[in-house]
């Protein structure tokens, strides 16, 4: 996005033809700006879940540098973390408990459903993602609504998260 006096606007390739910076340099500058974007809230929101909320367009973009975010807030993500990006103003995350990985999944499904139901912005991503301790990221589920306060999710094939479920003795049914 290009910052203007009246707000921001998307940048298209025709805007870049006379730009003295390379695409990589522009991405690095954008990531620095994203990392510096102020937050209204950064902290626990209950039951092990964390959320980063901001008014800017780039709060959800902090997921591109999730390793740095995890280092800053020290959530204890030794077994990995699940995260979601329901809209541009929030990044939700929950460290995985290797003994009960479904707890983090339910937590992120509930956060995703609550945020998309009560926020005026369109949904950014329908997925819940897993970030392994190695930094690898995979989509693991799609929230499908809440039935009697119990979030329903469609579990996707995700080899790294499936291994965590198997190690915990959890059943990886397609709908949970």
Please annotate each region the language model reported:
Residues 59-74:
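Short amphipathic alpha-helix segments
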Residues 46-47, 74-76:
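Generic structural signal for short, solvent-exposed loop/turn connectors between secondary structure elements
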Residues 22-26, 61-65, 100-107:
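Short amphipathic alpha-helical segments
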Residues 26-33, 69-72, 167:
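Residues that form generic nucleotide/phosphate-binding pockets
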Residues 1-61:
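Charged, alpha-helical interface segments at or near domain boundaries
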Residues 77-176:
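C-terminal structured domains
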